[in-house]
Amino acid sequence: MNEENTDGTNGCSKVRTGTQNEAALLALMEKTGYNMVQENGQRKFGGPPPGWEGPPPPRGCEVFVGKIPRDMYEDELVPVFERAGKIYEFRLMMEFSGENRGYAFVMYTTKEEAQLAIRILNNYEIRPGKFIGVCVSLDNCRLFIGAIPKEKKKEEILDEMKKVTEGVVDVIVYPSATDKTKNRGFAFVEYESHRAAAMARRKLIPGTFQLWGHTIQVDWADPEKEVDEETMQRVKVLYVRNLMISTTEETIKAEFSKFKPGAVERVKKLRDYAFVHFFHREDAVAAMSVMNGKCIDGASIEVTLAKPVNKENTWRQHLNGQISPNSENLLVYANKEESHSKSLGKPPTLPTRLNGQHSPSPPEIERCTYPFFPGTKLTPISMYSLKSNHFNSAVMHLDYYCNKNNWAPPEYYLYSTTSQDGKVLLVYKIVIPAIANGSQSYFMPDKLCTTLEDAKELAAQFTLLHLDFNFRRSSINSLSPVSTTLSSGTPSMLPYTSRPSSYPSYPLSPTISLANGSHVGQRLYISNQASFF
């Protein structure tokens, strides 16, 4: 421990010696009865607390705390977080110098206490002018395994992963959208703990590990979205996956209406999955239990309640399952143990104005700045000489996509209308000249935006979706097609196959839809289809 640390409590700069630090921590331990141990760059207070019997608290009981002053320690932090409830474990990340690393994890005994901590302590002024951030901590136990031979079955993948890694609980494998006898070339491997998943990733990550003669790709799977129980109790939409490409919305509606005619409000289908809207929640829940595992057009379907995207402004970007602990921005992330050296975290790519819509996040992109020293040699290049993972916006991806297919650049046409409350609303129509004579003459989302940037980004996302451009970590399920998808006669295209998410989601609150054209300006194309949500 350092001999001296600067304590800025009450806005003054006073020096607290290492001996004083130690005395303060010992006093805290004596007062609470908790043990404290330092290991692997973190100091653990409790875990379990005195008198605890039984297993640790379940997933969802831990919160992440960011932007902690570097000279603040458990004797000051623990009393603050005890206001929300009983602390099971407090883990403060530490530097070799004895300072903390600016962030910590607090595990409560119940989920309710963790949620209360987020509500009352996020943006809490811990010292004059110093505000901490508190959000849910996602304990990721799932790895993404890519480049798997498509003919391998779930049992084969499970057996192989158990041979090469420890703690494997389950493997999630999804059938191909076009051939249900094959997998999609990737799987999600569930481990018994985050530590087991981290050890497996460490073993497999070098890039030289092979399964069945194939060099596999390994990364943290995107953590499943946590939605509070109160919100889920209002969900009336089912997410249906593993459908045949040829299955129509009419067929899906008919199948889900069999148990109670008239219960289904509408169906929206994209490729091999769909959202089934019900008028009443109880009918949705009943249909889920009846239809899960049933066959439609020869395909065994999976049915779950669709998870809304939280419309609140949260920090959600993670870097390979890990936050940047030095960042001044608070980031929700998936991994908890290994530090990340980058000092500038990746900001959200598209604001919550689009209600959960996010620009494509290319594989392993790193958003950070580096020093630009005088005399640094620079070489002129074309953006088209770069790889797709150098672009972060859908607009740039679409331009890149067209160039790689030897198409002319996309043409953007801006339209506007005025809302009932007088706001100017915008939407872009995109024309791709190379395919304009095909079955899809243009692309236009059925949502209106209030800013030019959002309108352009949304239109590009919509277009990429209908060009079979798969986003790696985005959910763009609220976009409805304007007309039929591209025909098989479309000019050959360079595919951009990316890692899909392991969970469904949909916007909790939609942007303004074009489905009702009563207030739409004269120049605006009006979609005759209702929006997703």
Curated annotation (Swiss-Prot):
Expressed in the testis and ovary (at protein level). Expressed in spermatogonia and spermatocytes in testis (at protein level). It is found in: Cytoplasm. The gene is Rbm46. It comes from Mus musculus. Disruption phenotype: Male and female mice are infertile and show meiotic arrest in spermatocytes and oocytes. Severely impaired spermatogenesis with a complete absence of postmeiotic germ cells and a marked decrease of spermatocytes in meiotic prophase I seen in adult testis. Spermatogonial differentiation is impaired in developing testis. RBM46-target cohesin subunits display unaltered mRNA levels but have reduced translation, resulting in the failed assembly of axial elements, synapsis disruption, and meiotic arrest. Keywords: Cytoplasm, Differentiation, Meiosis, Oogenesis, Repeat, RNA-binding, Spermatogenesis. One of its GO terms (cellular component) is nucleus. The keyword Magnesium does not apply. This is Probable RNA-binding protein 46. Residues 338-362 are annotated as: Disordered. One of its GO terms (molecular function) is RNA binding. Its main location: cytoplasm. It holds the Pfam family RRM_1. InterPro entries: HnRNP_R/Q_splicing_fac, Nucleotide-bd_a/b_plait_sf, RBD_domain_sf, RBM46_DSR, RBM46_RRM1, RBM46_RRM2, RBM46_RRM3, RRM_dom. SMART domains: RRM. SUPFAM superfamilies: RNA-binding domain, RBD. GO terms for biological process: cell cycle switching, mitotic to meiotic cell cycle; female meiotic nuclear division; male meiotic nuclear division; mRNA stabilization; oogenesis; spermatid differentiation; spermatogenesis; trophectodermal cell differentiation.
